[in-house]
Structure formats: C-alpha cells, structure tokens
C-alpha cells in the first residue's frame, strides 16, 4: 500500500489537496482537503479596515469580485452602515456579471477537460455532431461548417505536436466516455466560451474600473460617477451597452452552457455518487 499526495490540484478555483492510498494500481481510500488560510489574513492585521477589500480580492484571479464585496460588507456591517440604492444596484450588476463569467470559465476552461477527450475530435463526423448539437438547442454556432472548422483546428494542433491549452491531458483514458461527436461539440463550445466569458468580464470592468480586481468599491458604497449627460461617467449609453453584453452572455448560458452540462453529466451517472466523504 502506497500513499500519493497531489498538492495543489490545478484547474480549480481555490486551493485543493488530494491524498490517496493505492494498492497495486487501485485507489483504496481518498481524502480531499482545502487550504482555507491564504496568508492575506496576516497582511490585514493593523491596516485600515477600509482597505481590506483591495487585499482580500487577491485571494484568487478568477473569483476576485466576491471576496472584495464580502470584505467591504463585513466592514459596513461592523459600522452599521446602509449603502445608497444606486450603489447596491451597481454592486449587484458587478456580481451577476462576475457570476456569469465565473460559471462559464469554471465549466469549460477549468473542469471540462477532465471529461472531454480533445484528441477524439479527429474521429468525429462534423455533420453528426451538428445534428446532435441542434437537437439540444437552436444555437446558431452549432452548424456543420462550425464543427468542421473546429475539427480542422484541432487536427492542426495535433499534427504540429503543440496542443497549447490542450497539452498534458489524459487523452485516450478509458474513463472518458463521450462519443467523438460530443467531444467535438464540447471543444467547439469551449472555444466559443472564450468570447462569452470575455463579454461578461467587460461588464465587470466597465463598472469596476478593471478586472480582475475591481477598483470602484468603497466602504459605504461605490466610487462610480453617474451623469446621464456625460460620456466620461456611467450614463444611459453605457448601461445599454452593458445590457446588450449581458443579453449575449445569457443567450449563451441558456442555449449552450446548460445543455452542455446536462449532456456531459448524462455520460457519467456514476459520478453522482462519488465524493460523499468519510467520517
């Protein structure tokens, strides 16, 4: 019996450690643990509490905004402050835009490659893949032409020997169950998701000053100038622009993300029972 420790686990949000006991190549027991302490807690000691949100959002480069707002709310609660309604609206818009970005990135760009075999795309029939995708939703990005373009792109990467973001995967592993066509759909949507997560992040940056790590929050509200007649501030034109960006992202989530999650999950029903934990 040997013990293997993997720390840290990559392609996740946060910190994760896995310990496993292996006997003749078979995992007998496994433990998952997360490191809660990051060290920023020590940095904050003795500092002005109004600065805390600037530091705490550095916990993560993906889920940054929620740490900033949780921190500033903690200070506001301690001071018994109520923020203006417009400030709450702006914070809410930042949070929802960030949540949309975060879910898209987490599924497609962090988690999906544990379930999707990129190299199997080379065996896929683009026409069949398009037919399967169109049976799930009426998304315009599911055409045969789109699937052919993605297959050719992956073929070029494989033939070059430089897989880029798809390097070092467990390609060909028997635990991967998706058909070649579903793999092609997933990779196609992986690439499309790069654009849609960016649209959501644009909204965060437009309101927060930049992303990652927004700059507009303050204890007691936000630091956004609002003037409907000035192009240099938050005005109606900017709000309309953000609305259009969010509508694009919502369309992708409803017609691509949700069907993809359900489709991939359907190939791995046994995983719903894993990870129950030990006592």
How does the language model describe each region?
Residues 1-279:
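Active-site bordering "gate/hinge" segments
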């Amino acid at each position: 019996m040997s013990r293997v420790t993997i720390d840290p686990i990559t392609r996740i949000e946060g910190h994760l450690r896995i310990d496993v006991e292996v006997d003749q190549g078979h995992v007998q027991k496994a433990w998952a643990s997360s490191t809660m302490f990051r060290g920023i807690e020590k940095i904050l000691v003795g500092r002005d509490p109004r600065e805390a949100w600037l530091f705490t959002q550095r916990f993560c480069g993906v889920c940054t905004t929620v740490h900033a707002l949780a921190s500033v709310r903690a200070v506001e609660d301690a001071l018994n402050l109520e923020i203006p309604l417009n400030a709450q609206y702006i914070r809410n818009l930042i949070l929802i835009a960030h949540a949309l970005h975060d879910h898209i990135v987490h599924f497609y760009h962090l988690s999906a490659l544990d379930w999707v075999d990129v190299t199997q795309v080379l065996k896929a029939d683009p026409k069949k893949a398009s037919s399967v995708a169109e049976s799930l939703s009426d998304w315009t990005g599911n055409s045969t032409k789109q699937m052919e373009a993605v297959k050719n792109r992956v073929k070029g990467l494989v033939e070059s020997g430089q897989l880029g973001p798809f390097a070092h995967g467990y390609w060909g592993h028997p635990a991967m169950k998706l058909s070649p066509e579903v793999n092609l759909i997933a990779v196609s949507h992986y690439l499309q998701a790069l654009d849609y997560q960016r649209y959501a992040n644009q909204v965060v940056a437009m309101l927060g000053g930049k992303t990652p790590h927004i700059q507009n929050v303050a204890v007691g509200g936000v630091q956004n100038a609002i003037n409907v007649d000035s192009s240099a501030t938050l005005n109606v034109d900017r709000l309309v622009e953000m609305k259009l960006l969010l509508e694009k992202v919502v369309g992708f989530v409803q017609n691509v993300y949700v069907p993809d999650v359900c489709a991939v999950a359907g190939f791995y029903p046994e995983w719903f029972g894993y990870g129950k934990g030990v006592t």
